[in-house]
């Protein structure tokens, strides 16, 4: 009997919706990253993109524990000298909560080419409404 190896022909992708309201951003990001990679499937293969589609709603209502709203920064760099831009998470959560959640999920994923394809299946919304009703996503508890 040979070992099962997942490939594009034998992967079944499901849709999951995660409600982030009142839950820590890190715990929500860990669950989303595991679903995107397919680590909670029996057919998980590390080198293959065998994960599911994930929808995160209420990203603006996710919580950061401790003083992270004031002490944690989102940093980007343009590549030029003096091109570092810093934004406190308090401001980032008010203006772009989807970006804050995407950065958290990306930080929980490995740094490889499978991650790039997996993150394309991540859909994040600040509010409760989402556009993927036709896919009939299953609710997933954190």
Regions found by a protein language model. Give the residues of each.
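Ribosome large-subunit tunnel/peptidyl-transferase-proximal elements
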Residues: 1-103, 109-113, 131-142
């Amino acid at each position: 009997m040979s070992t099962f190896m997942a490939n594009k022909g034998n992967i079944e992708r499901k849709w999951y919706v995660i409600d982030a309201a009142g839950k820590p951003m890190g715990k929500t990001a860990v669950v989303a990253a595991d679903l995107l990679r397919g680590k909670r499937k029996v057919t998980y293969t590390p080198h293959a993109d065998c994960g599911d589609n994930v929808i995160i709603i209420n990203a603006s209502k996710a919580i950061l524990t401790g003083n992270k709203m004031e002490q944690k920064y989102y940093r980007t760099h343009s590549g030029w000298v003096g091109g570092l831009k810093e934004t406190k998470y308090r401001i980032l959560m008010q203006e772009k909560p989807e970006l804050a959640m995407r950065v958290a999920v990306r930080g929980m994923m490995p740094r490889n080419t499978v991650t790039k394809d997996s993150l394309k299946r991540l859909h994040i919304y600040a509010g409760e409404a989402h556009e993927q009703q036709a896919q009939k996503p299953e609710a997933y508890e954190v």
